Amino acid sequence: MKTVHYKYDRIPYLIIFTDPTPFKDTYAGEMGKTVLKSHLIKPQGAESDTVIVFMHPIGGGEYLPMPTALVKAGHHVIYCQSRYPNNDTALVMEKVVVDMGACIRDAKERLGYKKVVLAGWSGGGSLSALYQSQAENPTITETPAGEPPSLIDANLIPA
């Protein structure tokens, strides 16, 4: 059986959403808004209603081997960076869960994907598991430091 390797298109885009947090814990940007850098990577000539979403708590991974290999095999992939793109030591994991929720909502509502499959590379694996658990049964009301966000109030949608 011959293996097909699709050529693909990489479409960078931004996800911008309202974030009611009373302070800005990253370096720049409009107060009350969060901006996530994302890449939609689609194989040419392979339509799909399913997309595989990758996110890592810190740093970018849109050029890692796994997302690229999946696209070359015919799968649609989104790599979405969190609000902590530069190995930021200010990371608050609960906020990254909110970021992943914004990416999943955008994939379903704006991009039109019916199914979202969560995938993870390193810290992205634990992030994906935490996200899905909180989307299905939210229990986290604040960070360990007693600060927002509450994932109960985040209106996360399951992947």
Positions of predicted regions on the chain:
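Primarily recognizes the serine-hydrolase "nucleophile elbow" in alpha/beta-hydrolase
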Residues: 106-109, 114-159
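Catalytic nucleophile-loop/oxyanion-hole region of alpha/beta-hydrolase
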Residues: 83-117
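Short, surface-exposed "cap/lid" segments of acyl-processing enzymes
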Residues: 34-37, 41-87, 106
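A generic membrane alpha-helix/interface feature
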Residues: 74, 92, 99, 138-142, ...
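Short, surface-exposed basic-aromatic patches at helix termini and helix-loop junctions that form
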Residues: 68-76, 98-101, 105-110, 133-137
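N-terminal cap/lid segment of alpha/beta-hydrolase-fold proteins
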Residues: 1-50
